């Protein structure tokens, strides 16, 4: 299942924008499709889907610690899904710290949330670079950093509208954060930079409505 065309186009455009030093947030649309149900929940995010309307594209990948993660089998947690480079020096560390802020906001809420990262740098990620990234981002949520061969990852990047390009000394890629509910359905997509407080608020709303 492919991402909405407008989101894919924005993600690819943002991929180019990052190479030029332009934040993805500058490419945000003035309005995005929102379901009546999500309006009632007062959710944020540039793309929103009604409950049960769009299954998140399925994938199964191994984590940095070696265990296999299947998105389709994950029903215990609301999943925050994003795509990062552990050696990135620009947008990724910023998003990492924002995700840390989301986790701290949710710490006392009791909401079952898991952070799932799919790498955009299968050529350079190491366990050491992943641990360093996680430590500097100060994550307190349960998290998984998933990888695989470029051939295995490309269909997943494509399904979620993530543009990835190798350039000398860097990986240029788009930055999108998805929320997948406990039924395995897409609910919200945020373009970078998002507001951590709004993401945490949306997750609380979804947890109460599920």
Residue ranges of model-derived segments:
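N-terminal targeting signals for export/organelle localization
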Residues: 1-58, 209-210
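Hydrophobic beta-strand anchors of alpha/beta hydrolase catalytic cores
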Residues: 80-81, 115, 177
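A short beta-strand-turn-helix
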Residues: 59-80, 103-106
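Structural microenvironment flanking redox-active thiols in thiol-disulfide oxidoreductases
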Residues: 94-156
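Thiol-/selenol-based redox modules, centered on thioredoxin-like
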Residues: 167-210
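Structural micro-motif
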Residues: 142-143, 154, 158-178
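Short active-site neighborhood of thiol/selenol oxidoreductases, capturing the structured segment around
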Residues: 71-99
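Short, small/polar residue-rich loop motifs at catalytic or cofactor-binding pockets
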Residues: 54-56, 77-78, 172-174
């Amino acid at each position: 299942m492919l991402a909405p065309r407008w989101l894919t186009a924005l993600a690819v455009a943002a991929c180019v924008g990052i190479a030029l030093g332009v934040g993805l947030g500058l490419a945000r649309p003035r309005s995005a499709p929102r379901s009546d149900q999500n309006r009632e929940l007062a959710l944020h995010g540039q793309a929103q889907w009604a409950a049960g309307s769009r299954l998140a594209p399925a994938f199964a990948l191994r984590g940095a610690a070696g265990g296999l993660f299947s998105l389709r089998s994950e029903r215990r947690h609301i999943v925050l899904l994003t795509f990062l480079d552990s050696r990135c020096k620009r947008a990724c560390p910023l998003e990492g710290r924002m995700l840390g802020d989301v986790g701290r906001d949710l710490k006392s809420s009791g909401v079952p949330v898991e952070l799932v990262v799919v790498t955009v740098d299968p050529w350079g990620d190491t366990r050491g670079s992943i641990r360093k990234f996680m430590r500097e981002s100060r994550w307190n949520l349960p998290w998984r950093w998933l990888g695989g061969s470029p051939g295995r990852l490309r269909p997943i990047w494509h399904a979620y509208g993530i543009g990835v390009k190798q350039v000398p000394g860097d990986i240029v890629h788009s930055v999108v954060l998805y929320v997948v509910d406990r039924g395995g359905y897409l609910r919200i997509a945020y373009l970078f930079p998002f507001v951590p407080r709004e993401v945490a608020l949306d997750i609380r709303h979804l947890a109460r409505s599920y």
